[in-house]
Amino acid sequence: MIYRTRTYIAADWTGDKDAVNQLTMWNEGKKWGLSFGDAHELSSCRSDDTNNCNIKKNCSQNLDHSKYFVLIVGDKTKDTRAGYCMYCKAYNTCSYTYKTNKSFIEFECKYAVNNNLPIIVLYNSNKVDKSKCIDSVVNVAKAHVAMNDNYNNWDYLSVKAAFDMLGK
């Protein structure tokens, strides 16, 4: 039996690393009340020289241990193509039967939706723009929240309120 105790964070790790780092800082800091077990501590879902299918397999295993799903949306999230099988070095010789032309982010989002994980969407911006959100989660997320206030400062209280909605 798998115990779902983690929170899975999906993001364009190139363009929105600052937002991921901010969540991590709030999670690890003693001052803040944001507290979650990071699913990425289980195995790496980072793109490197590993076959894209192996990375997606690791991501799905991490998602299987996750109770919640957080998508960070930035300016290029919807256009990110990292993880498409056709971009994999082993595409022509790949023996995996579950090849998919979904990016890592699209794969993660669809997996979360198919497994009924509660989802929140955090925008690495001072406004919510649902047109930038991945299609599979835009209408099922419990909350869509901007991570920045009108002065482009990190908005902890709004993010915390969104996390609090996950448990409801």
Predicted regions and their residues:
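Conserved N-terminal substructure of TIR/SEFIR domains
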Residues: M1-Y68, G167-K168
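Proline-rich low-complexity regions
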Residues: G37, P118-V121, I134-D135
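Secondary-structure junction/capping motif
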Residues: F36-D38, T100-F104, C133
